[in-house]
A protein has these predicted regions:
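Extracellular leucine-rich repeat
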Residues: 2-470
């Protein structure tokens, strides 16, 4: 074998090492790193200048290998330049913390029909780089989280015909043009607009997105929910609606009437004190997951929930509810599997409150003011419960609680959560002792009659002693 042939073989091996997707040598792509994945190369470049990136990526291009991930992190670029990715076959591009505020119109020209994911989060964009993205016909996911966007202009996502997921979380968006989503493909199924500055549901901009399934509007400044807003939007495919952490005070009648396939509704951490009896009209046969935690409710809104025949989860944690009434879960409770009532002010549970809960698996009653757990109240649900949490309640430990102590040590051992934190508050001898550590013969009840006669005896004894000593 001649020397020139040997050198050529060595150079070839250097550029395209063994394995289906061979990485260039570390020296060739410094300061980038390369790892081989089953579907292509994983290239990561950090703390690099533009010229260094051009040189490194040019070396990668010579391998003719597919790049599954190209990750650019902490590179001070300002602008994503043109022709940086010439000759590359990139499927997923991530450019985080690169101080990007713009993208050259030719930046994606060589990968426009290949790029499936574009992540430009944690940069400095004040405007969606629409023109640069217009030809990304294969793009499925776009992430612009944590930038400085204040408005979404008309046709902001024009040309993104394959887009399924769009995330705009953590910007400063106050205004969305009614034509913002014109030109985007009708396949868009998920939009995250959380942690912005919206004051109303952006129904008109969203009205033509007929395939939208998940809409996240949490952590905004929305104060009212109007039925006409969702009617304008359409929402015939909307499955998940997240409105948590807003400023909603009341749920009006037929608020979600047009969202007839809505399966999950999150309204936790608002200011809700009133729910109209017909608030959920129109979604009775679809709603399964409902979060109303950390609001200002003073009772379980049973009249409003009564027709939710498919409801599986009811989350009412962190409200001002003081009692569970006998019909609070009637008749909709038959399919309920998860009930969250922790961090309320519960002092009373009606003896027949849980009778209709045939499918209940999780019951959270921790951090309330319950001092007793009568057997007859909880026996209807003991066979189905998988999680039962009652810690941080002022439990009075006497004979009436003996059944619970036995259950915790036997069948309920895997069901009762934080058993060692489920402690007695009274009587004083048992204060702060875990219920499970108290024996049955210690759990006694003093009859009221005995207490009455003991008091009479003390009074008579005291009177007699006074006469004898006087």
């Amino acid at each position: 074998m001649t020397l020139p042939v040997l050198i050529a073989i060595l150079l070839t091996l250097n550029l395209c090492q063994c394995g289906r997707f061979g990485c260039p040598t570390r020296v060739q792509i410094k300061p980038c790193l390369c790892n081989e994945k089953s579907r292509g190369l994983d290239i990561s470049c950090e703390n690099a200048k533009v010229d260094q990136l051009r040189e490194a990526l040019a070396s990668v291009a010579q391998t003719k290998q597919a790049i599954w991930y190209l990750k650019l992190r902490n590179n001070h670029l300002g602008t994503l330049p043109a022709h940086l990715m010439v000759g590359l076959d990139v499927r997923h591009l991530i450019a985080l913390h690169c101080n990007l505020s713009s993208v050259d119109e030719l930046a994606f020209s060589s990968i426009a029909d290949k790029l499936e994911t574009l992540d430009l989060a944690q940069n400095s964009f004040e405007r969606v780089p629409s023109h640069a993205m217009e030809n990304l016909t294969a793009l499925v996911s776009l992430n612009l989280n944590y930038n400085r966007l204040e408005i979404l202009h008309a046709e902001a996502f024009k040309g993104l015909q394959s887009l399924l997921r769009l995330s705009l979380y953590g910007n400063r968006i106050k205004f969305i043009d009614n034509l913002a989503f014109v030109g985007v493909g009708r396949n868009l199924t998920r939009i995250n607009l959380g942690a912005n500055q919206l004051t109303a549901v952006p129904s008109r901009p969203l009205r033509n997105l007929s395939q939208l399934q998940r809409l996240q509007l949490h952590e905004n400044h929305i104060e009212a929910l109007l039925p006409e807003e969702f009617a304008i939007m359409g929402g015939e495919s909307l499955d998940v609606l997240d409105l948590a952490n807003n400023r909603v005070q009341t749920l009006p009648p037929r608020a979600f009437m047009s969202l007839q396939v809505l399966n999950s509704l999150d309204l936790e951490r608002n200011l809700i004190s009133t729910i109209h009896i017909h608030a959920f009209q129109g979604i009775e046969d679809s709603l399964e997951w409902l979060k109303l935690g950390v609001n200002r409710l003073e009772e379980i809104p049973s009249q409003s929930l009564r027709n939710l025949s498919r409801l599986r989860q009811l989350d009412l944690r962190g409200n001002n509810i003081s009692k569970v009434r006998e019909d609070d879960f009637t008749p909709y409770g038959k399919n309920l599997k998860f009930i969250y009532l922790q961090n309320n002010w519960l002092t009373t549970v009606d003896p027949i409150a849980f009778v209709s809960l045939d499918s209940l698996e999780w019951l959270h009653l921790q951090s309330n003011q319950l001092n007793t757990f009568p057997y007859e109240t909880y026996t209807p649900i003991l066979n189905t419960l998988q999680v039962f949490d009652i810690h941080d309640n002022p439990i009075h430990c006497d004979c009436k609680i003996a059944w619970l102590r036995d259950w915790v040590q036997n069948k309920g051992a895997s069901v009762v959560k934080l058993a060692q934190e489920t402690k007695c508050e009274t009587p004083e001898d048992f204060q702060n002792l875990p219920l499970a550590e108290i024996s049955n013969d210690q759990l006694i009840c003093v009859a009221k009659a005995s207490i009455h006669y003991a008091a009479i005896f003390v009074q008579v004894f005291s009177t007699t002693a006074w006469f004898l000593l006087s």
